[in-house]
Amino acid sequence: MLATTIFATLLALAAAAPHGPSHGPSVKTGDICGNGNTMHCCNDESVTNKLTGPSVLSDLDLRKLLASECSPISVNVLLNQLVPIDNKCKQQSICCGEQKQNGLVNLGCTPITVLG
């Protein structure tokens, strides 16, 4: 009975293991925006640093909500060149929801973690 249990466990583990090499480009999870979001590159943090400097607002960590001097990144550029997002942005890459982002300071965006 013990041998049957061990054999069944080993068989289940072998069936659950991935088979063969994965195909396609490798994408870090930090390089992906959710459905309906657009990717932006923000190359200046001076506005957010001034707004979140030593003050009452510094306790709120508004850097997660504010971004400055951002421009949209074309998904075609990233897919055609297979270049990670951290090679395209000097400071911070962000994902912004479906609201229009035209101003100097953009609200409602989520930073994309750049893994070194």
Curated annotation (Swiss-Prot):
Which UniProt keywords are present, listed alphabetically?
Cell wall, Cytoplasmic vesicle, Disulfide bond, Secreted, Signal, Vacuole
Q: In which tissues is it expressed?
A: Not appreciably expressed in any of the single-cell types (aerial conidia, blastospores and submerged conidia), but constitutively expressed in growing mycelia and when cells are sporulating on chitin and insect cuticle.
Cellular location(s): Secreted; Secreted, Cell wall; Spore coat; Vacuole
Q: Is Secreted among the key words of this record?
A: yes
Q: Name one GO molecular function term.
A: structural constituent of cell wall
Deletion: any effect? Causes a failure to assemble morphologically irregular rodlets into orderly bundles. Retains distorted surface bundles, but leads to truncated/incomplete rodlets within the bundles; and displays both decreased cell surface hydrophobicity and adhesion, but the mutant is unaffected in virulence. Does not affect radial growth and multiple stress responses.
Species of the source: Beauveria bassiana (strain ARSEF 2860)
Q: Cite a GO CC annotation.
A: fungal-type cell wall
- Disulfides per UniProt: 33-95, 41-89, 42-70, 96-109
Q: What is this protein called?
A: Class I hydrophobin B
Task: Summarize the protein's role.
Answer: Aerial growth, conidiation, and dispersal of filamentous fungi in the environment rely upon a capability of their secreting small amphipathic proteins called hydrophobins (HPBs) with low sequence identity. Class I can self-assemble into an outermost layer of rodlet bundles on aerial cell surfaces, conferring cellular hydrophobicity that supports fungal growth, development and dispersal; whereas Class II form highly ordered films at water-air interfaces through intermolecular interactions but contribute nothing to the rodlet structure.
